[in-house]
Curated annotation (Swiss-Prot):
The virion is composed of 60 copies each of the F, G, and J proteins, and 12 copies of the H protein. There are 12 spikes which are each composed of 5 G and one H proteins. GO terms for cellular component: viral capsid. The lineage of its organism: Viruses, Monodnaviria, Sangervirae, Phixviricota, Malgrandaviricetes. This is Minor spike protein. Changing V67A: In phi KhT mutant. It is found in: Virion. Phi KhT, a host-range mutant of phi K, can grow on E.coli C and B, besides K12, and is more thermosensitive than the parental phage phi K.
Length: 332
């Protein structure tokens, strides 16, 4: 825009001055000379007359031998074809001079623009501008040289640094929070595991104590039932076998199915034998003691750990020396 303005001004000045001056000069140089009708006696060229004057001599298109007086320029009167030729020459010269001056003014304008903006190529002008700004203002950065304000560039840089710091703080906080959560989860898991183990241990101990208590209570109830209820031989055998097996499990002894069946048959047979002996001697104790010993020996054959318990059970069921006899359904 600056180049166009300056070029217009230069062109106007140079064109106006040159055109005005040259035109004025041409007008003065090629001004139409005065045409005088030449009159002479009897001579004419169709546009005027050619006459003879005794004082000025013969007036014609071509000055002849009649020389004007000394100190006086001959008058040049042109007309007809010669006048048109003069006009053509004058106009051609003026056009040629105007074209030359116009071309010169254009060259001057282009040269002036090149000097001001540094060439016609945009790339060259841009490079020249950058080099000039870098040399003239070395303290500015490229953004500021391109037109960005220093305050705006500083604010932008500060905002970017602030965003980086905030992002770093967020990442650090997330990492710390994740670490704290992991530590809390580990502590909670450890507490739950320890509590579970302790609860399991206490529960197992309590269950064992309760089982033993229930077994003792069950044995007492069975003993009471056997002592106060008349049972058949089969029922008595079943109760004795149940208590015997429970006791064997408590002591860690395990019997096979065949051993259990054999033991049950022997107990059943011994109870039948006790029933027969009781009928023979209702209040006798020797038969009861012998039967108890036989059952004890029989249980010992199946499991040695049940011998003492079986003896105690028989001693509790069949009161030795009691006058009421055996509390079974063998009474008649």
């Amino acid at each position: 825009m600056l180049g166009s303005i300056i070029g217009g001004i230069g062109s106007s000045l140079l064109g106006g001055i040159a055109s005005g001056g040259i035109s004025s000069l041409l007008n003065k140089m090629f001004s139409k000379m005065p045409e005088h009708a030449a009159s002479s006696a009897g001579l004419t060229n169709g546009q005027g007359t050619i006459g003879m004057d005794t004082d000025a001599g013969i007036q014609s298109a071509i000055q002849g031998s009649n020389v004007p007086p000394a100190g006086q320029l001959p008058a040049s009167n042109t007309s007809g074809v010669m006048a048109d030729a003069g006009n053509m020459i004058r106009n051609a010269g003026r056009a040629l001079l105007d074209g030359t001056i116009q071309a010169g003014s254009d060259k001057v304008k282009e040269a002036l623009i090149d000097k001001l903006v540094g060439g016609n190529d945009a790339k060259d002008r841009g490079k020249a501008t950058r080099d000039y700004l870098a040399a003239a203002f070395p303290e500015l950065n490229p953004w500021e040289r391109a037109g960005a304000g220093a305050s705006t560039a500083g604010l932008e840089s500060s905002a970017q640094n602030q965003q980086k710091e905030m992002l770093k703080m967020q990442l650090d906080n997330q990492k710390d929070i994740a670490k704290m959560q992991m530590n809390n989860n580990l502590q909670i898991a450890g507490i739950q595991s320890a509590t579970s183990r302790q609860n399991t241990k206490d529960s197992v101990y309590a269950q064992n104590e309760m089982l033993q208590y229930n077994q003792r209570e069950s044995q007492a109830r069975v003993a009471s039932i056997l002592a106060n209820t008349d049972l058949t031989t089969k029922q008595a055998t079943h109760e004795i076998m149940r208590m015997a097996l429970t006791r064997a499990q408590e002591t860690g002894q395990h019997l096979t199915n065949s051993q259990i069946m054999a033991l049950e048959k022997k107990v059943y047979a011994e109870i039948g034998k006790i029933h027969q002996d009781t009928q023979n001697s209702r209040y006798g104790s020797s038969q009861v003691t012998a039967a108890a010993k036989d059952v004890t020996n029989m249980i010992t054959d199946a499991s040695s750990g049940l011998a003492d318990w079986a003896s105690q059970q028989w001693d509790s069921f069949f009161k030795d020396g009691k006058s009421d006899g055996i509390p079974l359904n063998t009474r008649k």
